Regions:
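Post-transcriptional modification and biogenesis factors for structured RNAs
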Residues: 1-179
Length: 179
C-alpha cells in the first residue's frame, strides 16, 4: 500500500476519509478523447496535492490505472462523456473553469503566466482542465474558461508532458491556497 506511514494500518475507507478531510475545494480534469497515458499521473498528483476530485472527459471509462499506485481508490474520479456535460457539471457545482494550455495567441486576452503572483487571485473552487498530449484543449473549453494558465517555456521544446504540467499547476495552486 503506497500511503503515508501513519495510514498504513488503516482500512481503505479510513484512508479515503482522511483524504476527504484534508483536501481542498479544487479539482482537476483531463480531456480523454483518444486515450492518454497521463491520466494516471493526473490522479496521483491530485491525491498528492490534496485536490477534492479528478475527472476525465470524453473517451471511454477504460484507462490504465497502474500509474496511480492505488490513489484512484482514495481520490474521487469521475468520467463525463462530453465537453458540454463537463461545462454543465462545473456550473452546477460552483466550479471556476481554469484551462491550462500554451501556444494559443488567439486567447492572449485571458491567458496568464503561472509565474504571475496574481494568477489565482479571486478564483474560488477552481477546476483545472488539461488537454491531451497531441490535441490540447478545444475552442469550446477555452471559450468557456474563466482564464487560461500557461507555463512559459525557456528552452527549445514546444510543451511539457501533460502529467508533469498537472503536477506543476497543482503545486503552485496548493502553495497559493496554503499561504
Amino acid at each position: 500500500m503506497n500511503v503515508l506511514d501513519h495510514l498504513k494500518q488503516k482500512t481503505l475507507d479510513e484512508v479515503k476519509s482522511y483524504c476527504k478531510n484534508t483536501c481542498i475545494d479544487a479539482g482537476v480534469a483531463m480531456m480523454h478523447v483518444s486515450g492518454d497515458f497521463n491520466l494516471s499521473t493526473l490522479v496521483r498528483n491530485a491525491n498528492f496535492f490534496g485536490f477534492k476530485e479528478a475527472m476525465y472527459v470524453g473517451g471511454s471509462k477504460q484507462w490504465d490505472r497502474r500509474g496511480t499506485v492505488g490513489t484512484h481508490h482514495y481520490t474521487d474520479l469521475n468520467h463525463i462523456k462530453t465537453e458540454e456535460m463537463f461545462v454543465g457539471y462545473l456550473k452546477d457545482n460552483g466550479y471556476t473553469l481554469i484551462a491550462v494550455e500554451n501556444n494559443i495567441p488567439k486567447y492572449s486576452d485571458k491567458t496568464v503566466s503561472i509565474f504571475n503572483q496574481w494568477v489565482f487571485t479571486g478564483i474560488d473552487k477552481p477546476m483545472f482542465v488539461f488537454g491531451e498530449e497531441k490535441s490540447g484543449l478545444s475552442d469550446y473549453i477555452l471559450d468557456n474558461a474563466e482564464t487560461i494558465v500557461t507555463i512559459p517555456e525557456y528552452g527549445s521544446v514546444r510543451s511539457l508532458n501533460v502529467g508533469t504540467t498537472s503536477g506543476i499547476v497543482m503545486a503552485f495552486y496548493r502553495n497559493y491556497y496554503e499561504y
